[in-house]
């Protein structure tokens, strides 16, 4: 168990270099520089509403496009989340929140299960928000879920403004994650699984936890 619930990840590829420092029991302190302005804005939402202390620096081949950097930020953040959670002892495990932003309404339901899965149902009406390709929202969450071991369901209930839809999504995710990773005082430090174990992302065990 990671008693301090903190993690650092440094990921280097031929396309990107990403450094992440994540604290789960934080106050929402955020210092991020991904080279993608809109992604930075969304990471601030994640940190603020999830009460995560987040430091992130990314350098990538954004002269080509934002795809590699956006995805690798999701990968590194997911790895940091998995590492900080450790064996997931004593947490609530499940979280859900529905966040409004003006006309937009997005619901996120998640399970810190060790079983990576994403069901993504955002219908973003424009291809870009500023210079950010809106198809990259899905790629970010796929990378994060796969590398953190989250079961993640994202549903858009309403919305017509692209910025509002995506921001509501990040806020709902942040609040859901905060609920799921909080300590459950009734659990007394036990693992929230009937099997007594929750896999960490990257584990090779064939039998998954339920």
From Swiss-Prot:
Disordered: annotated segments: 185-210
Catalytic reaction annotation: D-erythro-1-(imidazol-4-yl)glycerol 3-phosphate = 3-(imidazol-4-yl)-2-oxopropyl phosphate + H2O
Keyword tags: Amino-acid biosynthesis, Cytoplasm, Histidine biosynthesis, Lyase
Highest taxon above the source species: Bacteria
Gene Ontology molecular function: any one: imidazoleglycerol-phosphate dehydratase activity
Cellular component per GO, a single term: cytoplasm
UniProt-listed GO biological process terms: L-histidine biosynthetic process
EC number of the protein: 4.2.1.19
Pathway membership: Amino-acid biosynthesis; L-histidine biosynthesis; L-histidine from 5-phospho-alpha-D-ribose 1-diphosphate: step 6/9
Any Pfam family hit: IGPD
Transmembrane residue ranges: none
Alphabetized NCBIfam families for the sequence: PRK00951.1-3, PRK00951.1-5, PRK00951.2-1, PRK00951.2-4
Family to which this protein belongs: Belongs to the imidazoleglycerol-phosphate dehydratase family.
Name of this protein: Imidazoleglycerol-phosphate dehydratase
Organism: Prochlorococcus marinus (strain SARG / CCMP1375 / SS120)
């Amino acid at each position: 168990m990671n008693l301090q619930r903190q993690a650092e990840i440094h990921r280097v590829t031929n396309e990107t270099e990403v450094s992440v420092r994540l604290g789960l029991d934080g106050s929402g302190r955020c210092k991020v520089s991904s080279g993608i302005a809109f992604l930075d804005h969304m990471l601030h939402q994640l940190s603020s509403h999830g009460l995560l202390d987040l430091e992130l620096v990314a350098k990538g081949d954004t002269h080509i496009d934002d795809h590699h950097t956006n995805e690798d930020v999701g990968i590194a953040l997911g790895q940091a989340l998995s590492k900080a959670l450790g064996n997931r002892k004593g947490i609530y495990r499940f979280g859900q929140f529905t966040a409004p932003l003006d006309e937009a309404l997005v619901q996120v339901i998640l399970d810190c299960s060790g079983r990576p899965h994403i069901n993504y149902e955002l219908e973003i009406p424009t291809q870009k928000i500023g210079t950010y390709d809106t198809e990259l929202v899905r790629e970010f969450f796929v990378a994060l879920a796969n590398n953190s071991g989250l079961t993640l369901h994202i549903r858009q209930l309403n919305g017509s403004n692209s910025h509002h839809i995506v921001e509501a999504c990040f806020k709902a995710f942040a609040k859901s994650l905060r609920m799921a990773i909080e300590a459950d005082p009734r659990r007394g430090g036990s693992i929230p699984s009937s099997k007594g174990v929750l896999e960490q992302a990257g584990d090779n065990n064939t039998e998954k936890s339920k």
